[in-house]
Amino acid sequence: MANVVVVGAQWGDEGKGKIVDWLSERADVIARFQGGHNAGHTLVIDGKVYKLSLLPSGIVRPGKLSVIGNGVVLDPWHLVQEIAKLRADGVEISPQSLMIAENAVLILPLHGELDRARESQNSVAKIGTTGRGIGPAYEDKVGRRAIRVADLADEATLALRVDRLMVHHDALRRGLGIEPVDREALLAQLREIAPQVLPYAKPVWKVMNEMRKAGKRILFEGAQGALLDIDFGTYPYVTSSNVIAGQAATGTGIGPGAIGFVLGIVKAYTTRVGEGPFPAELQDADGERLGERGREFGTVTGRKRRCGWFDAVLVRQTCATSGVSGIALTKLDVLDGFETLKICVGYELDGERLDHLPIAADQQARCTPIFEELEGWSESTAGARSWADLPGAAVKYVRRIEELIQCPVALLSTSPERDDTILVTDPFED
């Protein structure tokens, strides 16, 4: 029996929520290990739509333990709102079904204020953040001045942490023309929210290791995508955490030996939200068609996603950096009706052909795609649950992707409904 890590293998929005929900039915524990409430996921269960951005996808399934690991930065006010919204939808949430790492870092109102002020004043190179304070919270974590969940339990410690934080943030705020932090107001907000968060606080590393020893199935749920990884993404147009599969161990404290199968989620075409290089981007009728058919708008921000053809170069790269065992290919049905499809198989940079995306931002921006054309199909793939249900051209398209990315397809998703899935390899089997 293998524990499974699910990671996005593009720029996020690959359909991880559906796949995680599909797998979570057989998992005992579903753990998030990085990111914040900046990456949303949509679940469709029995015709009912759930939109989550912080809580693990398993939270909507009774009898499962959902975990927010130490690698996550936690906005406690958003947490309480998301819990309340799900409860209103009939989802039961208690400390028996939700556990938060005691050493998870808190996102405070001052982090969002700093995030938005920087982005609004940065006319040279906007990063395209969601403005929710994720980046500044990670900065404070690395700078050893963050407030963590456990700090909420002791008022004296909390006051010391706030004072240390203010030394840094007030200096930044002066430079940006923002009023200083209101110390007493912040402390009052934290005291008020503490009783609503602390019941869920646990030593996640300990519980997770105990679960592993007891033979429980663990599903690690990544947010965003590997091309937004702070080290291996299109820097600086990235998120502020490691997104690749190795972070599942670091972000929960369970150790890399616990990971048995890495499932990379890959859309049958490519999308990106916000700024940054996108070699295979389409700024024509085909790009508009992909966006309309795929309903490419962000779950959290509502921002329109940029669309392009499938980029095999990037996915091959992310499969390598995450050690992907197999991919789940999603949204194949969006390609129904295209007479011709294209796959990016390489880049040209200054007259030279490349088989990978260079690390330097200026070179990334100058890369032009080299496309391979494939025959499209007119039949519908929506709702297909076996290879026999797929048009021959669609099967050829999937097989060509496998060849180019040097990684097999483990799952194929053909609609937002969780059961419209073709299983090739069961990630939970050893």
Swiss-Prot record:
Entry binding sites for IMP: 13-16, 38-41, 130, 144, 224, 239, 303
PROSITE patterns found in the cross-reference section: ADENYLOSUCCIN_SYN_1, ADENYLOSUCCIN_SYN_2
GO molecular function: adenylosuccinate synthase activity; GTP binding; magnesium ion binding
Disulfide bonds: none
Positions annotated to bind substrate: 299-305
Entries under Pfam families matching the protein: Adenylsucc_synt
Pathway as given in its UniProt record: Purine metabolism; AMP biosynthesis via de novo pathway; AMP from IMP: step 1/2
InterPro entries: Adenylosuccin_syn_GTP-bd, Adenylosuccin_syn_Lys_AS, Adenylosuccinate_synth_dom1, Adenylosuccinate_synth_dom2, Adenylosuccinate_synth_dom3, Adenylosuccinate_synthetase, P-loop_NTPase
Enzyme class: ligase
Subcellular location, record wording: Cytoplasm
Record: active site: 13, 41
Reactions performed catalytically: IMP + L-aspartate + GTP = N(6)-(1,2-dicarboxyethyl)-AMP + GDP + phosphate + 2 H(+)
Cofactors (names): Mg(2+)
GO biological process: 'de novo' AMP biosynthetic process; IMP metabolic process
The keyword Lipoprotein is assigned to this record: no
Subunit structure: Homodimer.
Protein name: Adenylosuccinate synthetase
Protein source organism: Cereibacter sphaeroides (strain ATCC 17023 / DSM 158 / JCM 6121 / CCUG 31486 / LMG 2827 / NBRC 12203 / NCIMB 8253 / ATH 2.4.1.) (Rhodobacter sphaeroides)
